[in-house]
Swiss-Prot record:
Photoreceptor required for image-forming vision at low light intensity. Required for photoreceptor cell viability after birth. Light-induced isomerization of 11-cis to all-trans retinal triggers a conformational change that activates signaling via G-proteins. Subsequent receptor phosphorylation mediates displacement of the bound G-protein alpha subunit by arrestin and terminates signaling. Residues 334-354 have a biased composition (Low complexity). Contains one covalently linked retinal chromophore. Upon light absorption, the covalently bound 11-cis-retinal is converted to all-trans-retinal. After hydrolysis of the Schiff base and release of the covalently bound all-trans-retinal, active rhodopsin is regenerated by binding of a fresh molecule of 11-cis-retinal. This is Rhodopsin. PROSITE patterns: G_PROTEIN_RECEP_F1_1 (PS00237), G_PROTEIN_RECEP_F1_2 (PS50262), OPSIN (PS00238). PANTHER family: OPSIN (PTHR24240). It comes from Rhinella marina (Cane toad).
Length: 354
């Protein structure tokens, strides 16, 4: 074996020289140079510096502006809330650990950080599933004139948390485990060992199939059908130009969110799957560290995409930041332009940007 397995950790280095130490007790500078840990620390500080205000303002602006409290926005707010929690409970832990060169919070802290990282990623994924289904049902109309109501949105939010907990919680109760990964400063599910004592193999397979492949299949199916429907409607002029434009704008925003999710998480999932299917193979600590830390940037991009592509929300954000006044003076126009179709809360033939 090219790694060293301990009772609650796995170090991607053989202990032939006797230098390997527990990542909960000693700095791991034999895995990487101290400056590399400093880079990780600076990166996490940047994510906190950006992620905290962006997600907080997304929540605050929506609470302050009643017109933004629409059904589809509940799902997007759910994303912001989960990301905010990740920043506070996960990123701060990882930053401090990187500063010290090892996971200073012990095994309990590792479970906490791993849980919130997994929970946040899964809430994001299942929220995108709910958004994809909403887009499919509203635009493709398989259920005739379906209206995405507040009750549907609440059920969608509850569904994302149930599915995310079904993925993140089992390691807390003995099915698999959370261990330090890569350079041993952040924690995640144990992809490195089979660990029969905690039935690790079955959990990793369950996680990949139920909480990664199936959601992606649903998302690609919904958007595949949606693209075909939009093209057919445009060709046949079945909807008004305003409605078609509104549907396309909402769909574009959600598709961009999906693309960025894939950019952030597919490298991590691919590396994890490779490690799991090549037990004992040789790989360096940076091999898992880079995709793991890159995946954490997902806490920032959804609110940014939402703010960039949603004129109504962007104007409300500017108004809030400027103490109730919009220096660009187009808030009312934006509100009027979107009031007909905001957030899929009207009939299925009238959909606009959330």
């Amino acid at each position: 074996m090219n790694g060293t397995e301990g009772p609650n950790f796995y170090i991607p280095m053989s202990n032939k020289t006797g230098v390997v130490r527990s990542p909960f007790e000693y700095p791991q500078y034999y895995l990487a140079e101290p400056w590399q840990y400093s880079v990780l620390c600076a990166y996490m500080f940047l994510l906190i510096l950006l992620g905290f205000p962006i997600n907080f303002m997304t929540l605050y602006v929506t609470i302050q502006h009643k017109k933004l409290r629409t059904p589809l926005n509940y799902i997007l707010l759910n994303l912001a809330f989960a990301n905010h929690f990740m920043v506070l409970c996960g990123f701060t832990v990882t930053m401090y650990s990187s500063m010290n060169g090892y996971f200073v919070f012990g095994q309990t802290g590792c479970y906490v950080e791993g849980f919130f990282a997994t929970l946040g990623g899964e809430i994001a994924l299942w929220s995108l599933v709910v958004l994809a289904i909403e887009r499919y049902v509203v635009v493709c109309k398989p259920m005739s004139n379906f209206r995405f109501s507040e009750n549907h949105a609440i059920m969608g939010v509850a569904f994302t948390w149930i599915m995310a907990l079904a993925c993140a919680a089992p390691p807390l109760f003995g099915w698999s485990r959370y261990i330090p990964e890569g350079m041993q400063c952040s924690c995640g599910v144990d992809y490195y060992t089979l660990k029969p004592e905690v039935n690790n193999e079955s959990f990793v397979i369950y996680m990949f199939v139920v909480h990664f492949l199936i959601p992606l299949i649903i998302i690609f199916f919904c958007y595949g059908r949606l693209v075909c429907t939009v093209k057919e409607a445009a060709a046949q002029q079945q909807e008004s130009a305003t409605t078609q434009k509104a549907e396309k704008e909402v769909t574009r925003m959600v598709i961009i969110m999906v693309v960025f999710f894939l950019i952030c998480w597919v490298p991590y999932a691919s590396v994890a799957f490779f490690i799991f299917t090549h037990q004992g193979s040789e790989f360096g600590p940076v091999f898992m560290t880079i995709p793991a830390f890159f995946a954490k940037s997902s806490s920032i991009y959804n609110p940014v995409i939402y703010i960039m592509l949603n004129k109504q929300f962007r104007n409300c954000m500017i108004t809030t930041l400027c103490c109730g006044k919009n220096p660009f003076g187009d808030e009312d126009a934006s509100s009027a332009a979107t009031s007909k179709t905001e957030a899929s809360s009207v009939s299925s033939s009238q959909v606009s940007p959330a």
